[in-house]
Amino acid sequence: MPRIHVLPPGLVNQIAAGEVVERPASIVKELVENALDAGATSVGVDVEEGGLALVRVADDGSGMDRDDALLALERHATSKLRDAEGLAAIGTMGFRGEAVPAIASVSRFRLDTSAGEDGAGTRVEIEGGVLGEVAPVARPRGTTVEVRDLFFNTPARRKFMRAASTEAGHVSEAVIRLALARPDVGFTLRSGGRLVLGARAGGGLADRAGQALGREAHRHLLPVDARRGEVRVHGLICSPDHSEATGRALYLFVNGRYVRDRAAAHAVLRAFAGTLPPGRHPAGVLFVELPLHRVDVNVHPQKLEVRFAEGREVFDALFHTVAGALRTAPWLRARPQPGDGVPVGDGGGPAPVPVAGEEAAEVLAWARAARPPEGSGATLVQPAPGAWATGRLAFPVVPAPGAGPEAGPRPEGYFAGLRYVGQHARTYLLCEAPGGTLVVIDQHASHERMLFHRLREAFRARRIPVQPFLLPQVVTLPPAAARALEAGLAELGRLGFDAEPFGGEAFAVKGAPAALAGVDLTALLTDLGSQLAEVERGSAVDDAFHDLLATMACHAAVRANQDVSPEEARALLDGLDAIDFKARCPHGRPVVFELSLADLERRVGRR
């Protein structure tokens, strides 16, 4: 039986390097973080062959004297941590004291550093973990680290490296993350002598975000800043007009440290629910700040993951901050302002909470409903004869007593300020905005968004008005949808349906949400049955009900190639101003398109 023995220090460092030094980008991250912890105001990074031949990081930080320079190359030697209490509240980027010796053990390593203003410094050279020359060197205050021939003494690790261009891309991404975290610090990155990134100190987060996300994304950035309890979320997020195919363009930082956290990213994605097309992801740069003792950063070899004491609190803060920004953003809505009947949060925008049951019932009175909840104060709107069969619009004009359809004040919002011109192709509403801008509104997408909003608010308040049928309507569904619907009758009831099995694949529907007057119940319940199969317990339930409500709104909304009267168009425009989000339908398609008078005149040669 083999005897247990203690590994030699060089091998220990190489094993540690396997965790800390995954690729050249890992070296860049560790060395730049050390520079930032040293108070650097300027950091320069140079790489050759993607960092495999050379990584050089130079900074103007505090530097080190000779003794500290040598001690920094010992394992678990650090200036950033002294006791267990400090480990529970880490505020620096590094703290373990293992990265530098691990890097030096798998490369030809040189450290030049100076802590004084007299130009006297120290040079330390190490090859494969073996200490070489230690000599004085003339240099200004700060530190320069050169790492050459990475993994020269561990060929098994070297062969797993990607092409130089791929590794250079990872280095660039690492520097971008660090530059986003510290807009107050200047950064340069050169690869093969070519300047890849130049970010001046103090340029602001918007400039850094533009460099990271691209010029097109920069045009769509919205500021976010809110606090919930002890958690503050701030930064920049792209409006739904710009999205990405993957989630890589969403940069999340916790107490200044870039992290990968699926729950946090999902919170942001949830905030965008119903605003992005399927398969698209939001982009932005978000910072989460909370007390140091409430987050554990010592859970990942490269400190890319963290553990929160109260993860739900962070999730809620991210969700409500981003969702609130989308509701209050200027591009999204000009009104209503505080006092217009919309719940107002601390920041002056709509509060990110469900509306009360009375308010939900009141807005749902737009639908051709028969019975709003008692005490709601909602206007009773009886369904027109044959409404369930004709499929007419579910937003009838309800004028004040004795007034015509144009009487009475309208919401003082963007859509209320439009002059309705007419309908194009029986699908688009054409309007004129002040200043001559042509506004084209997709009648189905806009009506779908309005119905979805009202269904969602009523669902949150558990007050969806139900239209009971005089006689049950029997619908027959495909076998798979019928099985899912029968298993999900409880969820169906929460959505406002009163249905029960009627033998085989048939169901007797005794009532349905009043907002869905005129829909094809068979088609709707078939779609809902398919989606109900995806409803699970836990966090997935809210996502699933979002999709169910979106399907209900889609079926109830006016269709393309359907006539809309001027009164109905006006009612739709006024209704859009009363909801918190109207730029996209629940499935992420745009609702509105604008063409300025200047653009129009350029297109016809008048300018």
Swiss-Prot record:
GO molecular function: ATP binding; ATP hydrolysis activity; ATP-dependent DNA damage sensor activity; mismatched DNA binding
Record field: transmembrane: none
Domain of life: Bacteria
Pfam family, one: HATPase_c_3
GO cellular component: mismatch repair complex
Keywords: DNA damage, DNA repair
One GO term of the biological process aspect: mismatch repair
Gene3D superfamilies: 3.30.230.10, Histidine kinase-like ATPase, C-terminal domain (3.30.565.10), MutL, C-terminal domain, dimerisation subdomain (3.30.1540.20), MutL, C-terminal domain, regulatory subdomain (3.30.1370.100)
Keyword Secreted applies: no
CDD domains the UniProt entry points to: HATPase_MutL-MLH-PMS-like (cd16926), MutL_Trans (cd00782)
Function (record text): This protein is involved in the repair of mismatches in DNA. It is required for dam-dependent methyl-directed DNA mismatch repair. May act as a 'molecular matchmaker', a protein that promotes the formation of a stable complex between two or more DNA-binding proteins in an ATP-dependent manner without itself being part of a final effector complex.
Stated family: Belongs to the DNA mismatch repair MutL/HexB family.
Protein name per UniProt: DNA mismatch repair protein MutL
Encoding gene, per UniProt annotation: mutL
